[in-house]
């Protein structure tokens, strides 16, 4: 995977579990977007086919060239997998014009032409070791029924002392392949292939051309010699696709630098820390690497490096060293072979082979090469590839045998397997830790949910209780409101009653004033009468006793009036409201009135008896009218007693007074004065008795009404309701009486 800022940032700031989860999510997102892209591409093609339109080019429809900030032509070779890249490389020239667009037609055409270029196009690179030969094989690689030449392999010899390559040259010369075997028949094909060798690790001079074209592959080579270092093979070749699969000893703590050129350079950089010591003798390696051996197979295995030009514009491949599986890109079809000769020492010193970065740059075609010469060169190139592949296979077997025989060395595959097992164990440990954390988080989540549920239940209970209290408060508030309303109504009623009672009290006060005025007038009249009687009795001696009696009676009448006035003032006003309390008062007043009535009746009877005796004496002294007068007097006395008992004394006395005035007008003054005084006393007594009887009747009626009220109160709510109705009617009647009294008072005023 390409290293960028996001990957570096997330590697540094996150742990491994989070990193795995993040990349899993990103990969699934990428799969989803790829699926959408595939669906849209399929619909676009179906749409074009259905309406007979020309199918669009998949590469021309891309927007990379519009959004590329570098301004260079975009590379589409990284968008092709190995299978489709091989299919594009294997297409002939005549099929290159089929439905890929102008740019991609040129790309396929260039790939087909480069396939046919002989390996003799690349001249050998001169160095301190001499010219590097490029043997050409006869066989190519067959993949999916298609034949293509082998890939490029470069071997390096490593010794203790490092030897700079081309120390005298800062820029290597451009070598062209001699054209002794073929001639150019067609000048339309023009290609130039330049090979540059540079070393980044040992400060070797870079081999470069001044021409800057589209594609470039840099393969820096470092050659180091060692006297006693063992030989080491840093890679092996896959049998099917001949990709470079780097293998080296790796420390987990070391980070391997991954270099990716913007122009699509294919760069492999390996830093070797440990030397792989082979147990085999140096003769086996020297037989493989020495160009002077007699056997052709050993001569073929002396190839140190082979390179192949890529058809596409640029090839980007970044190889990650370690337990990750390396990414491989298909290398081009034009090989370039570089032979580094092996120098054997007499002491058969072991040598170490190290694979370093080799940069190969391809230029735009500038040579006119004959097509027939290219076809002939292709056959020799395929045979060289076949022999190279066989030699590398034998070398791999020898190196593996040497590793087995070496007690200190460890096989690369075994070490990789061991590291893979360690990584798996670590991964299992991480998974177990993740499972433990997941279980802990699940337990914590369950506890949290239980706590949340408990809090929700408590909250619901508190809400229900709050609602219940709220309802109770609302009901209590309603009850209080009703009670306040009732109290307000009662207050209004009480105020009305107080106002009515005040009005009634005012009426009673007026009545009292009237009664007092009447009483005063009566007192004045009685005094006038008494004064007249006293003056008359003072003239005669016979009138002394009667005068004393009259004074006594007068004083007694005044005291009785005062007592009655005080009694009227002590009469309760709110009799109806305080029923039970007033019953006793009524009974006491009734008894007092009855006692006074008895006293007055006794006095009346005494007076009547005295009058009867005097009249009898007068009748005996008269001249013969005793019988008639006696008969009349008996009738009168009997009538008087009946009137007293029936409370009709005043009209009777008036009638008697009228008769006596008419009948005895010629009598003496003594008799007339005596009769007038007696009549005045009788009138006052009769008035008092009438008033007492009226009051007694009122008290009796009130007493009966109060008894009925108390009985109705004892019966319950119905009686109380009935009593309220009766009282309301009484109030209405009283209001009517009060209004009449007021109207009468206003009229009188």
From Swiss-Prot:
Pfam families: Zein-binding. Residues 411-509 form the GTD-binding domain. The chain crosses the membrane at residues 17-37. One of its GO terms (molecular function) is myosin binding. Disruption phenotype: No visible phenotype. Myob1 and myob2 double mutant has no visible phenotype, but a delayed flowering. Myob1, myob2 and myob3 triple mutant has a significant height reduction and a delayed flowering. Myob1, myob2, myob3 and myob4 quadruple mutant has a significant height reduction, a reduced rosette diameter and a delayed flowering. Residues 589-621, 676-710 form a coiled coil. It is a single-pass membrane protein. GO terms for cellular component: membrane; transport vesicle. It is found in: Endomembrane system. Residues 164-184, 608-640 are annotated as: Disordered. InterPro entries: GTD-bd (IPR007656), MYOB (IPR039306). The keyword Transmembrane applies. Its main location: membrane. The GTD-binding domain is sufficient for myosin binding. Interacts with myosin XI-K and XI-1. Membrane-anchored myosin receptors that define a distinct, plant-specific transport vesicle compartment. This is Myosin-binding protein 2.
């Amino acid at each position: 995977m390409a290293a960028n800022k996001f990957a570096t940032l997330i590697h540094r700031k996150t742990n491994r579990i989070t990193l795995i989860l993040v990349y899993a999510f990103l990969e699934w997102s990428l799969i989803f977007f790829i699926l959408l892209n595939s669906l849209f591409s399929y619909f676009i093609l179906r749409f074009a086919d259905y309406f007979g339109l020309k199918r669009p080019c998949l590469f021309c429809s891309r927007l990379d060239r519009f959004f590329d900030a570098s301004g260079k032509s975009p590379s589409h070779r990284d968008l092709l997998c190995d299978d489709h890249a091989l299919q594009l490389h294997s297409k002939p020239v005549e099929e290159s014009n089929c439905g890929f667009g102008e740019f991609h037609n040129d790309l396929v055409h260039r790939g087909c032409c480069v396939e046919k270029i002989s390996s003799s196009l690349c001249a050998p690179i001169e160095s301190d070791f001499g010219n590097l030969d490029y043997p050409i094989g006869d066989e190519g690689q067959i993949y999916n029924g298609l034949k293509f030449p082998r890939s490029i392999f470069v071997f390096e010899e490593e010794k203790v002392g490092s030897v700079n390559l081309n120390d005298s040259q800062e820029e290597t010369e451009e070598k062209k392949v001699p054209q002794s075997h073929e001639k150019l028949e067609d000048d339309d094909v023009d290609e130039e292939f330049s090979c540059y060798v540079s070393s980044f690790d040992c400060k070797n001079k870079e081999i470069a051309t001044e021409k800057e074209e589209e594609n470039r592959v840099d393969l820096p080579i470092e050659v180091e010699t060692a006297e006693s270092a063992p030989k080491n093979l840093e890679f092996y070749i896959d049998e099917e696709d001949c990709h470079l699969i780097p293998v080296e000893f790796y420390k987990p703590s070391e980070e391997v630098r991954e270099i990716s050129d913007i122009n699509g350079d294919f760069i492999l950089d390996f830093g070797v820390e440990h030397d792989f010591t082979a147990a085999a003798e140096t003769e086996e390696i020297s037989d493989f690497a020495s160009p002077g051996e007699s056997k052709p197979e050993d001569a073929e295995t002396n190839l140190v490096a082979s390179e192949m030009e890529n058809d596409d514009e640029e090839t980007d491949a970044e190889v990650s060293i370690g337990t990750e599986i390396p990414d491989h890109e298909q290398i081009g079809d034009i090989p370039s072979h570089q032979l580094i000769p092996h120098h054997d020492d007499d002491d058969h010193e072991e040598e170490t082979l190290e694979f370093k970065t080799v940069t190969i740059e391809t230029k735009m075609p500038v040579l006119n090469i004959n097509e027939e010469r290219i076809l002939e060169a292709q056959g020799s190139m395929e045979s060289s590839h076949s022999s190279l592949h066989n030699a590398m296979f034998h070398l791999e077997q020898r190196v593996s045998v040497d590793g087995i025989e070496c007690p200190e060395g460890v096989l690369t595959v075994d070490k990789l397997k061991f590291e893979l097992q360690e990584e798996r164990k670590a991964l299992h440990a991480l998974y177990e830790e993740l499972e433990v954390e997941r279980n802990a988080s699940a337990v914590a989540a369950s506890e949290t949910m239980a706590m949340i549920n408990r809090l929700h239940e408590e909250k619901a209970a508190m809400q229900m209780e709050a609602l219940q209290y709220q309802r109770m408060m609302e009901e209590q508030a309603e009850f209080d409101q009703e009670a306040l309303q009732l109290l307000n109504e009662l207050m209004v009623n009480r105020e009305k009653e107080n106002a009515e009672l005040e009005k009634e009290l005012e009426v009673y006060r007026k009545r009292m004033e009237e009664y007092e005025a009447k009483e005063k007038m009566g007192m004045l009249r009685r005094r006038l009468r008494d004064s007249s009687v006293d003056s008359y009795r003072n003239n005669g001696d016979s009138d002394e006793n009667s005068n004393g009696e009259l004074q006594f009676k007068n004083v007694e009448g005044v005291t009785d009036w005062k007592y009655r006035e005080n009694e009227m003032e002590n009469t309760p006003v709110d009799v109806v409201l305080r029923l039970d309390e007033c019953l006793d008062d009524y009974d006491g007043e009734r008894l007092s009135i009855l006692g006074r009535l008895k006293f007055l009746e006794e006095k009346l009877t005494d007076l009547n008896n005295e009058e009867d005796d005097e009249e009898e004496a007068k009748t005996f002294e008269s001249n013969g009218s005793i019988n008639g007068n006696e008969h009349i007097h008996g009738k009168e006395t009997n009538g008087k007693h009946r009137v007293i008992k029936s409370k009709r004394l005043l009209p009777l006395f008036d009638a008697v007074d009228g008769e006596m005035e008419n009948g005895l007008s010629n009598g003496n003054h003594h008799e007339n004065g005596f009769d007038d005084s007696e009549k005045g006393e009788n009138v006052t007594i009769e008035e008092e008795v009438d008033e007492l009887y009226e009051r007694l009747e009122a008290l009796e009626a009130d007493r009966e009404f109060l008894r009925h009220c108390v009985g109705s109160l004892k019966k319950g709510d119905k009686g109380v309701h009935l009593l309220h109705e009766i009282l309301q009617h009484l109030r209405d009647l009283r209001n009517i009486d009060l209004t009449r009294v007021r109207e009468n008072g206003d009229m009188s005023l």
